[in-house]
Amino acid sequence: MIRQYLEIKKQYPDAILFFRLGDFYEMFFDDARLASRELEITLTGRDGGSERVPMCGIPYHAADGYIARLISKGYRVAICEQVEDPAEAKGIVRREVTRVITPGTVTEGHFLEDKKNNYLASIAPFEEGYGLAVTDITTGVFMVSSFSGVRAWSELIDEMARLNPAEVIIPLAYSDKMGGDLKQQGILAVSGYRDTAFSPAEAVPAFEEQFGSAGSLCNRTIDYHAAVAAAGALLIFLRETQKRVLKHINKAAFYRPGKYMILDANTRRNLELTRAISDGSRRNTLLSVIDHTVTAMGGRLLRNWIEQPLLDVAEIKARLEATEDLAGNAMLRLELKSLLKNVYDLERLTGKISFGTANARDLIGLKKSLANLPLIKQLLLAQAGAALLKDVARSIDPLEEVRELLEAAIDDNPPLSLKDGGIIKKGYNHEVDRLRQARREGKSMLAGLEERERARTGIKSLKVGFNKVFGYYIEVTRANLELVPEDYQRRQTLANAERFITPELKEYEDMILRAEERLASLERRLFDEVLERLSGEIHRIQKSASAIATADALYSLAEAAVKGRYSRPEIAEDGKLHVKDGRHPVLEQVMGPGRFVPNDTFMDNEESRFILLTGPNMAGKSTYMRQVALIVLLAQIGSFVPALFARIPVFDRIFTRVGASDDIAGGQSTFMVEMNECRIIVNEATEKSLIIMDEVGRGTSTYDGISIARALAEYIHTKIRAKTLFSTHYHELTDLDSMPGIVNFNVAVREEGEDIIFLRKVVPGKSDRSYGIQVARLAGLPGEIINRSMEILKTLELAAERPPQPSPAKEWPAYRYKENECHVIQELRRLNVLEMTPLEAINKLYMLHKKLTESATLKTTSL
């Protein structure tokens, strides 16, 4: 048996092998050590000849929970089942791996989030870029894209941040090169897969077998070879792990990420669109505020809308029109919600049908869902006015014949397992009805036999029973054994009774069990036939599921608009952004009605495209800037916005440089993280972007910080010309308002003695104080520290008013140098400043300053 295990394990070296032994899954050798540690189960051993074999095991009926724990940690699990009856086996029972479960191929509902796709991605490098294929095998979605040019990898990483796949496969030859960057995006499972799967020789046939001619992508992308390579490798991986053809994956949808607003990982994190920074949950995120979806399908679609804001004005206006239509009709919303409640997750049901794992209760859920489709269709056609809602209604296929099949074939209240019987409805199949009648008659005969035997023997406690090991029996207590007739044959002895069989009982047993065996086999065959017929209708079910998801997502936007008192934004084509009484959608909900202070925003293309925002900590600068970004994003997904009035131009990207933290794993300081984020902004932002920059330069010394912040502000204003909200504590920057297009705003406070009151109102003009000590007092720092802080502040302010004195340090011999001995000055002389960008100049200045500082430190130490 161990030899059999080792032969199978050799085929799946990168998976933990769950090896079926009776009622347990056993693991051996290194798999056992790993599973014992990760699952916290006892590590034992068994005799393996020359050495003791480490082993551990779990009950097969409890395997799902253990598998889920391993998958959540990024492991793969190969399920090895007994594929023949042990009673009929000659020698070792034949075993085969029936499925490999990986983070991206999980299908069981209890492993998954209902309202989140579980994506599996494949990346294929090529000479000028990358091909990408993405699937969610639980729903059948399969998407293909490609990235080329100098920014190909950066764009691909941004797309990975949006998709947040559970697993990514890449060519084995590229696993070291690409794996690190992908894992930095939080993708736990990044796996090298055999290179040949990405080659045209294997990938193209796999693609064409699943979808038809690969040439269908030729007209859509010049990089179709890379896209097909990624898609083909993904399909090969699925076939090798799932051991079946997935019929519900029937369409490869090519898409261009450039069709949507681009949001990099920093922006998604800083705006907390779908995951909170604090704990990674959806609590207190934008999604949590606007998600009023009723179905799991609608929830997944709404999440995708948030992560992919639109750029096409016509599409934005179509969603806004539909949202307005629903928001203005309370009865329509109420009826639609009521009907949607009865629609199950049709997308994932098609996955179960394709996998052959759908049970009878799943089919009853499908039947109930289909019964509501014509009602939803009629409701929208009759009451909706928006063109998008009409299109949705026309896309709903009622699938009447499918519902009629399920109504006729499947019992209305079936058991969960086929083994329990009773799944096929009475009247669907004559033979099923006949066998059930025979079984009932046999059991009625058993009841008559029991009565006759009690009368014949005089044993009133005599009873006829059944168990799976011994079959039917007559049980007699020990006190009555002397009354047992001679024709009773002993079958089993118990502590307080004995069990017998008679020729008549044996005849009834054969009749009943024969009927039950035939009935179970027939029900299984009929159920499989129903599943096969349903698998032929998967495409139609998916089409209706997509329409229902769209209706649900639009309902959610309308419900959020009504509950949040949102207004419909105008889409501006002149580039001007105007928000009246804008509010932060998440904080407003957290704080409760009427407590959030609204603020206005106006930005145009010339006079006020750059807002320089000052004010104390805790005053609300970051909240205000995020608020503007979220209002823009909501408008571009086709949602109403939290404002009295909003006029929003279409932005191609939103950038955020907010917060400060070290990247310890990446070996980057707070300041380096900040500068990397700034580099991305200045390299990738355009005139049509929205930039949010909060406290740039605070990760370094004051003068360095001021210099960098000022240079960045000037560069963004003059070179990029993007609409920008730029907050700072450096009051020296407020004179930037002398440049046309830069305006000063501050967050107002009111002073009362030594205390301040935050008014949370953004008003024109600059702030000349940071109120840091007052904020420290509010935070509860001891009075002794506060008082000492005030003394130090006064001393520093007085010193700032005196003329600067020469530093004695400059007279120290250790700091004297000759010009021809200073490499820094020589390097400065070689620089061509006119050919450098402001950011390059800043970075060079920073490095030269660092060299001088290190040199001075070394000389001082040598003294």
UniProtKB/Swiss-Prot annotation:
CDD domains: ABC_MutS1 (cd03284). InterPro entries: DNA_mismatch_repair_MutS, DNA_mismatch_repair_MutS-lik_N, DNA_mismatch_repair_MutS/MSH, DNA_mismatch_repair_MutS_C, DNA_mismatch_repair_MutS_clamp, DNA_mismatch_repair_MutS_core, DNA_mismatch_repair_MutS_N, DNA_mismatch_repair_MutS_sf. SUPFAM superfamilies: DNA repair protein MutS, domain I, DNA repair protein MutS, domain II, DNA repair protein MutS, domain III, P-loop containing nucleoside triphosphate hydrolases. GO terms for biological process: mismatch repair. GO terms for molecular function: ATP binding; ATP-dependent DNA damage sensor activity; damaged DNA binding; mismatched DNA binding. The keyword ATP-binding applies. It comes from the Bacteria. ATP binds at residues 615-622. Keywords: ATP-binding, DNA damage, DNA repair, DNA-binding, Nucleotide-binding. The keyword Membrane does not apply. Coiled coil: none annotated. One of its GO terms (cellular component) is cytosol. PANTHER family: DNA MISMATCH REPAIR PROTEIN MSH1, MITOCHONDRIAL, DNA MISMATCH REPAIR PROTEIN MUTS FAMILY MEMBER. This protein is involved in the repair of mismatches in DNA. It is possible that it carries out the mismatch recognition step. This protein has a weak ATPase activity. Belongs to the DNA mismatch repair MutS family. This is DNA mismatch repair protein MutS. It comes from Pelotomaculum thermopropionicum (strain DSM 13744 / JCM 10971 / SI). The gene is mutS.
